[in-house]
Curated annotation (Swiss-Prot):
Name by which UniProt lists this protein: Small ribosomal subunit protein bS18c
Cell compartment(s), UniProt: Plastid, Chloroplast
GO cellular component, one term: chloroplast
Primary localization: plastid
NCBIfam families to which the protein is assigned, alphabetical: S18
Biological process (GO), any one: translation
InterPro entries linked: Ribosomal_bS18, Ribosomal_bS18_sf
Domain of life: Eukaryota
Pfam families the UniProt entry points to: Ribosomal_S18
Family of the protein in this entry: Belongs to the bacterial ribosomal protein bS18 family.
Gene: rps18
UniProt-listed HAMAP family: Ribosomal_bS18
Length: 97
């Protein structure tokens, strides 16, 4: 093959196939908190389909299950707020000039 055609060839990279996040035996249900909590972010938001790598149908079922679990207070609407220590503010000393 001459050099001009060699420039357009792409190198074949090997890739590792990722396992699906929901196995065939897993049941998407609002009572299955261990499964549902994998699809919630640190802030308590429902993660997007791209992040989850779910199908449209699975994402819809997960979203409905999360909302049901929140309403039935199995999951919090907001996670517990982290308590930050407030820095002590120093008062200005008044100087007489």
């Amino acid at each position: 093959m001459d050099k001009s055609k060699r420039l357009f060839l792409k190198s074949k990279r090997s890739f590792r196939r990722r396992l699906p996040p929901i196995q065939s035996g897993d049941r998407i249900d609002y009572r299955n908190i261990s499964l549902i909590s994998r699809f919630i972010s640190q802030q308590g938001k429902i993660l997007s389909r791209r992040v989850n790598r779910l199908t449209l149908k699975q994402q819809r079922l997960i979203t409905i299950a999360i909302k049901q679990a929140r309403i039935l207070s199995l999951l919090p609407f907001r996670p517990k707020a982290q308590r930050f220590k407030k820095a002590q503010r120093f008062k200005r000393s008044q100087s007489t000039v």
